Amino acid sequence: MGLIVLGISFIVMISNLVGGSALVYLSSRKPLVSLLLVSYVWSVFSALFMGFVLWYFQLVPAHFVAWTIGIGFLECLFSIHNQVFIGQENWKIHNLLKLVQKIVQLVVFLLLGITLHHFVLALVASYLVSLLWSFFALKDSIRFEGNIQFVSVFKTSFVYGFQIQLSNIVQLLNYRLIYFIIEKSMGGVLGIYIVAVQLAESLWIPSKALAIIQYGKISNEIESRKKSELTVSFIHLSFLLTTLALIVLWMIPNEWVLGLFGKDISGTKPIIYALSLGVMSVALSQSFSHYLSGVGRYKQLLIAALVGLIPILFFGKYAVTTYGLVGAGMITSVSYAFSCGYLGVVFYRLSGLSLKEILVLKTGFLETFKLLK
């Protein structure tokens, strides 16, 4: 089951070079027909190319390769449509589609019986139902006007998509490179650190949800200053929610953590404290990075990820060997803070706002919450 899911994720990763989150930005700037056609053709290539790789290197059981290719293609289409809905700020359809897909998958899986073959069938059924609905939801938005801009749209989509995917890969190193350093330096205590990280990273859920809404709004906003002011509102809201979530996490008794994860997982609290600056930095970075995505400055995301990688590359081993798991949390926080700082400076330079306008929220939080509609 895990190999099939991994194979599907590889197909989607290649597809996202053209049909990924860049569609949110481009959906209000390029003809939708051209965007969809380019994304569909690229998703076919992604499924066939990655399917061949999976088969040739035997990364997926041979009798499930065709299923993996098919499901991967369906998930690519599903992802493409969802990115377009975000770009259209059609949150109702976007959220319902994701919910329906999961519900259908679970129901079919339970009805057929819990086997690997039935898991595959459940995935197929869930994506077919969701895709059928998404096609109907999109049909009114499609307008056939003039020639299909295949080549120009492909070039633009690929350049943006490549920058996004490359920054995601570097950011993944920022998130997880410290794991390898801990494993090499300290051995069996990695599990304790991973639990602390999972607890801390769960606090990113609100900021990530807010950032997706922000991305859609900024991509459709014409006035530059309004884009900046929207971002400031989301920054303050993300800061508030993350602060509250951090306080709650700090107050959770250590006994609860031991009861949930086992008595061997002790000493997570100091690590969580060390990660707190990093948690807040990533929460704020979500708003900065989605502003830059909304104005088409994807290259800055890659630079920010590389800036964040510097502390871990140069000081990661020293922090772990000298201060243990707390040191790992500290250097991780420094890494995230470096990225956040860079993104903040870029936002300040592009926004046209004064430092006071960024730091002081003009409207109340109740007014800011209305932006979520």
What are the residue ranges of the model-derived segments?
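Membrane-interface "helix-start" segments
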Residues: 34-37, 64-67, 93, 156-163, ...
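Hydrophobic alpha-helical transmembrane segments
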Residues: 69, 95-142, 307-311, 325-349
